[in-house]
């Protein structure tokens, strides 16, 4: 379940009152769109051998991100899910990452950099760590998937030798 530290709609939209009483937007519309309408929220069964899970966090701000990939036999990511506890920028970064990796191969997603996510969302420098979490979560999910596959293949090879 996604949760936010900010409690008001005004706070998470990044609206700040000016002396004239007019709102000033601090977040780009891409952040607001992915925050208000996050894509691919949820989770897969961690025990599924075709699912890789990346769980990363930022101790400094308390953001926590779980990103999961479902991979087919050819090594293509066919589906993805995420759950993020953190600010709107962290949720938006997770949502963008989950969209970008779907349909790509494991090798292709390993080339996605946080700077690309940050540029797309137009994150301010103080929020760059959110896009770094997304990049780290992608890499962690791929690593987890590959480790599962190596164990599965080793177990299958051992069974073949026994037979």
Swiss-Prot record:
Entry keywords, A to Z: 2Fe-2S, Iron, Iron-sulfur, Metal-binding, Mitochondrion, Transit peptide
Co-factor binding comment: Binds 1 [2Fe-2S] cluster per subunit.
SUPFAM superfamilies: SufE/NifU (SSF82649)
Superkingdom: Eukaryota
Molecular functions per Gene Ontology: 2 iron, 2 sulfur cluster binding; iron ion binding; structural molecule activity
Intracellular or extracellular location(s): Mitochondrion matrix
Principal cellular location given in the protein's record: mitochondrion
Family matches, as InterPro entries: ISCU (IPR011339), NIF_FeS_clus_asmbl_NifU_N (IPR002871)
Keyword Iron: yes
Plastid among keywords: no
Transit peptide region: 1-48
A GO CC annotation given for this chain: mitochondrial matrix
Described purpose of this protein according to its UniProt entry: Scaffold protein for the de novo synthesis of iron-sulfur (Fe-S) clusters within mitochondria, which is required for maturation of both mitochondrial and cytoplasmic [2Fe-2S] and [4Fe-4S] proteins. First, a [2Fe-2S] cluster is transiently assembled on the scaffold protein ISCU (ISU1, ISU2 or ISU3). In a second step, the cluster is released from ISCU, transferred to a glutaredoxin, followed by the formation of mitochondrial [2Fe-2S] proteins, the synthesis of [4Fe-4S] clusters and their target-specific insertion into the recipient apoproteins.
Subunit note: Component of the core Fe-S cluster (ISC) assembly machinery.
Protein name stated in the entry: Iron-sulfur cluster assembly protein 2
Species of the source: Arabidopsis thaliana
Gene: ISU2
